């Protein structure tokens, strides 16, 4: 399991190895004599980045087998060894862009075909985004019957576009309207255990529609289709950075708010105990050095994929898969390798994703695409693409000339929080179990969390950690 799609947690005690695919089960069934302690560094990393490092858990004594590795336990010596059997390739293809695009599409189609073998009832999560449009394009082009699923407020861009697609391509759409978001609080403990306490609670949103999906044979999920085919935050400077400088440059970039970090450097230094002032940057460099055989642009992609992807997105899929088979075409090994080999310059600004849709799935390209609060158009209708490009500039938050389009996760979610969750969040903050430890500056913590409209991840991570501590210590 080279991407850790199935987690394995373990510890050694009195010359025996104990392991489980469930973190909480492993804790619940441990011997009373086996003492566990809170992993303070993991707590800080989670608060800072909304994710974990590839082996971290919230318990010092319990580890997780990292991606692309196998674990062996020697019964005679009672020692473990972890060996790597897969790693990222440092090669970038020299093929023409046209040939690369053709190969990516061939591998994409093969990947979906494997997910659908023997499956009669097929579902996909439909939104206005690129991931679901790519899946939709394949199903429509092959005339495969399926059911679409969408959830959220009725006036969100994603919901509006999902309904447009359903009408245009004549598929059944199951829509779950969010009149409120109380399900976050009501199902908190259930969802925390399902995700091994490794997901900020605001990322629990896919679980609210599982009951509607439970009769499907498979749900095609778009996670990871975008990771390397859009070259997330691609920067030209990475093309020419020498390897001996790449670790330091990329570590500094990841330390900035927005790249990889929820907290900016100033906020982090205020919140974290002084003894941890250099912990995050030093940890980044240590982890990046493990991958420094890669050229700079691939080093950036690999690190982002591993920690934001395998440790942030995968818990959603792991939890959902306990109810229904959630298939990830984006993690098919042949598809992954095909996209990985493409130079970053071909993937920037969603170029490859747009060309994939325009060249092979034109039928679904005439409906607008949604990126947060921005709209893309890649269809053939004259003038519409130019119109949306102009609107994108006029509505950009940086300029504020026109009001931006409906941005649920960036704006409207806070109205729901204030209506449905604010008293609960305030109470959780006041009684946060991390305040009983010294790795945080308590006054600064309370001051930071008293602010209005913090990044969602700040609420999500702190509440999950606190409730984990209360349950297990």
Positions of PLM-derived features:
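Cysteine-centered catalytic environments shared across enzyme families
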Residues: 1-183, 190, 217, 465
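Short helix/loop capping segments that flank catalytic or ligand/cofactor-binding pockets
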Residues: 6-9, 27-29, 81-82, 228-230, ...
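Short alpha-helical segments and helix-capping/turn motifs at coil-helix boundaries
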Residues: 55-57, 202-212, 448
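Adenosyl-5′-phosphate
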Residues: 62, 216, 256-473
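Generic recognition of stable, solvent-exposed alpha-helical segments in well-folded globular domains
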Residues: 66, 99, 103, 107, ...
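Residue-level preference for long, well-ordered alpha-helices that form the structural scaffold
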Residues: 97-104, 195-198, 298
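A short acidic-Thr-Gly-centered motif at the start of a beta-strand
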Residues: 116-117, 209-212, 320
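ATP-dependent adenylate-handling ligase core
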Residues: 154-210, 223-248, 253-257, 293, ...
């Amino acid at each position: 399991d080279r991407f850790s799609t199935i987690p394995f947690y373990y510890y050694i005690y009195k010359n025996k190895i104990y392991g489980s695919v469930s973190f909480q089960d492993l804790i619940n069934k441990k011997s009373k004599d086996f003492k566990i302690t809170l992993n303070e560094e993991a707590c800080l990393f989670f608060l800072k980045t909304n994710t974990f490092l590839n082996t971290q858990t919230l318990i010092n004594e319990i580890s997780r087998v990292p991606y692309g590795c196998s674990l062996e336990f020697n019964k005679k010596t009672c020692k473990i060894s972890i060996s790597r059997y897969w790693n990222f390739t440092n090669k970038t293809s020299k093929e023409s862009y046209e040939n690369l695009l053709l190969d990516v599409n061939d591998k994409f189609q093969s990947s979906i075909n494997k997910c659908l073998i023997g499956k009669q009832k097929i579902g996909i999560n439909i939104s206005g985004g690129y991931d679901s449009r790519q899946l939709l394009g394949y199903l429509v082009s092959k005339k495969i019957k399926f059911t679409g699923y969408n959830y959220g407020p009725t006036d969100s861009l994603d919901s509006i576009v999902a309904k447009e697609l359903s009408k245009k391509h004549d598929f059944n759409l199951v829509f779950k309207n969010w009149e409120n978001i109380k399900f976050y609080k009501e199902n908190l403990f259930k969802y925390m255990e399902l995700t091994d306490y490794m997901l900020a609670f605001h990322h629990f949103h896919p679980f609210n529609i599982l009951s509607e999906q439970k009769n499907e044979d498979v749900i095609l999920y778009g996670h990871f289709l975008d990771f390397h085919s859009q070259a997330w935050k691609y920067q030209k400077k990475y093309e020419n950075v020498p390897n001996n400088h790449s670790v330091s440059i990329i570590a500094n970039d990841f330390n900035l708010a927005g790249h990889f970090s929820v907290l900016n450097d100033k906020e982090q230094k205020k919140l974290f105990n002084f003894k941890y002032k250099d912990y995050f940057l030093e940890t980044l460099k240590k982890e990046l050095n493990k991958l420094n055989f890669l050229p700079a642009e691939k080093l950036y992609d690999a690190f982002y994929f591993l920690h934001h992807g395998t440790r942030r997105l995968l818990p959603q899929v792991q939890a959902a898969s306990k109810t229904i088979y959630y298939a990830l075409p984006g993690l098919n090994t042949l598809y992954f390798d095909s996209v990985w080999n493409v130079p970053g310059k071909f993937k920037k600004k969603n170029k490859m994703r747009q060309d994939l849709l325009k060249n092979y799935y034109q039928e679904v390209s005439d409906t607008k695409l949604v990126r947060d609060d921005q709209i893309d158009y890649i269809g053939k209708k004259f003038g519409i693409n130019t119109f949306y490009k102009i609107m994108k500039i006029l509505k950009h938050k940086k300029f504020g000339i026109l009001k931006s389009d409906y941005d649920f996760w960036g704006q409207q979610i806070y109205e729901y929080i204030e209506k449905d969750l604010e008293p609960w969040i305030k109470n959780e903050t006041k009684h946060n179990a991390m305040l009983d430890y010294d790795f945080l500056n308590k006054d600064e913590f309370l001051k930071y969390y008293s602010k209005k409209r913090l990044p969602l991840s700040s609420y999500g991570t702190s509440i999950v950690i606190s409730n984990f501590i209360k349950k297990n210590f």
